[in-house]
Design a protein with these regions (language model features):
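Terminal presequence/propeptide segments associated with secretion/organelle targeting
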Residues: 1-519
Length: 519
């Protein structure tokens, strides 16, 4: 089955272009033109290849990576959906993880006569059929993206940790409302809301995991100690750099103090206001000229994928009551002025608004009907104006300045030997370690054949070949976002498994590399 838009990206060479980057930037050349010049200097090995220039080790090095691209990729096999998603997002970071979450693909290249031929790579991974045992050397090979930078001590201020706790609180609030009402829904409606529940719990667990691992392993204290040690070393060896380092730290702390009061407003806007269904439908109507007809239709389907008005009203009432109790600036003026209560406001809006039902929204999008006086549109305009005038602009400005300061601090920490890894940026990485003692195994034929037969597959159980096979195992390799599905190799270069997820404690690796937990 051909899959439009899917392609195979094969690394064919890497070139150190640090000298060219330094030379170009010193001449004042802008980045896009500099990359073009570098790609012209190192012409592609083959027509159709893709070249990327990536910065490594906080800007100490730059490399050109060239990839061969194969665009004809086809689906050969995937398990039944219930087996692929067994446990759902709720089971993330839990042991053992039992989902058959994989697919088998085949790539095709064009032959001399134009015929599509299966791609046969010069190098490939052999599968180790005997599985793997405890305490074996293993490697995770992949293109991670999740941990894009280390934190500095200014990032770990109380307000940032409280922000993550608030996010988890809102996720839990929405989950509680859905759980209380879901039993009253039809089987069809229940399915989409169960998907929402699973996604919300996934985000809640991830957020809480970051906070708990951050506090459990005293990451804020470790960040402070790392910077204090760097300052002491600079004071001994280079007093000028020491004062520069101190100034950067002071500037970071000042920027965080400016950002602090904005963070809670940003949380309210993103996690509450933008989670309200009619806000999203009003946004589509307001911004319809930005999208083509096909994309707009897909967005409408997405907004109304779980269209049950009773459930939606319950969720909206819960979110607005949450904002009202904390006296948020995003509470509608009618409620703020005590002209109407939260529940009555929501009931009235759902009676009067033409942006609640999918068919009505589609009709508005296809015509020129004005909805400026629609209560849902008025609330969207009200909340957007507050965010853009008082919060969004300042937050983007201060966050941009903090990013620049953070990077300079990280470079100094790297140069002094306190950071020895580069942020994951989608380039090829290998992490290494050993398998743990936790292994979960089953009888290959008897148990698996029985399970798959229940899905309609005709599978014969050959008792003579029945043997124990390890289906789940742990390693102490470092993985991060983007590593799901990455191949796990043994010391002979054989494929022994696919990486799925970290232990919940390892989530602190998104911001701070702690080998005892993250590796």
């Amino acid at each position: 089955l051909k899959i439009k838009g899917l392609y195979l990206k094969i690394l064919v060479r890497t070139v150190d272009v640090s000298a060219e980057v330094v030379q170009g930037l010193s001449r004042g050349q802008n980045w896009s033109n500099l990359v073009k010049d570098i790609c012209l200097k190192y012409k592609s090995i083959e027509k159709g290849n893709k070249q990327e220039v990536k910065r490594e080790f906080f800007g100490a090095n730059h490399f050109l990576h060239e990839y061969a691209i194969i665009k004809d990729v086809r689906l050969v096999y995937c398990p039944p959906q219930p087996m692929a998603s067994y446990g759902g997002d709720d089971a993330n970071w839990h042991w053992p993880r039992m989902s058959a979450d994989f697919a088998i693909l085949r790539a095709y290249k064009e032959g001399e006569d134009g015929e599509a031929l299966p791609f046969s790579p010069k190098y490939y991974l052999k599968i180790k059929e005997d599985g793997i045992g405890p305490d074996e050397q293993v490697y995770v090979l992949g293109y991670p993206r999740g941990a894009s930078y280390d934190w500095i001590s200014a990032d770990a201020k109380e307000s940032f940790l409280l922000s993550m706790i608030r996010r988890a609180e809102v996720f839990g609030l929405r989950m509680g409302i859905i759980n209380r009402n879901i039993q009253h829904l039809s089987a069809e409606d229940r399915l989409s809301w169960e998907g929402d529940l699973s996604s919300l719990n996934n985000e809640r667990l991830k957020t809480l995991g970051r906070v708990s691992s951050f506090l459990r392993y005293m990451i804020p204290e470790k960040l402070i100690a790392r910077e204090d040690s760097c300052g002491l070393l600079l004071h001994q060896n280079d007093i000028e750099k020491y004062w520069k380092f101190c100034n950067l730290k002071n500037k970071a702390d000042s920027l965080v103090r400016l950002i602090n009061p904005l963070v809670e407003f940003d949380d309210d806007y993103r996690d509450c206001v933008q989670s309200i269904p009619f806000i999203n439908s009003a946004g589509l109507v307001k911004n319809k000229d930005r999208f083509s007809g096909n994309i707009l239709s897909q967005l409408v389907d997405r907004v109304f994928r779980s269209s049950n008005v009773v459930m939606e009203k319950s969720v909206v009432k819960g979110l607005l009551n949450y904002l009202y109790q904390k006296n948020s600036i995003f509470i509608p003026m009618e409620i703020k002025d005590e002209k109407i209560g939260v529940d009555d406001y929501v009931d009235c809006l759902y009676r009067c608004s033409s942006l609640i039902e999918k068919d009505s929204v589609l009709s508005i999008l296809s015509g020129n009907l004005s909805v400026q006086s629609d209560p849902a549109m008025k609330y969207l305009v009200y909340t957007d104006s507050i965010y853009k005038s008082d919060i969004g602009t300042n937050l983007v400005t201060y966050a941009g300045q903090l990013n620049e300061v953070r990077e300079k601090i990280l470079i100094m920490l790297h140069d002094c030997g306190f950071i020895n890894w580069s942020g994951t940026n989608g380039t090829l990485r290998v992490s290494y370690g050993k398998t743990g003692t936790q292994c979960w195994s089953t009888n290959l034929n008897q148990d698996i054949c029985k399970a798959w037969t229940s899905y309609g597959y005709k599978m014969v159980c050959d008792k003579s070949r029945d043997k124990q096979v390890i289906l789940n195992f742990t390693t102490d390799c470092h993985t991060t976002g983007g590593n799901s599905g990455s191949p796990v190799l043994n010391e002979h270069g054989e494929l022994v498994g696919l990486n799925f997820d970290r232990d919940v404690d390892g989530l602190c690796g998104d911001y701070y590399y702690l080998p005892s937990v993250c590796q």
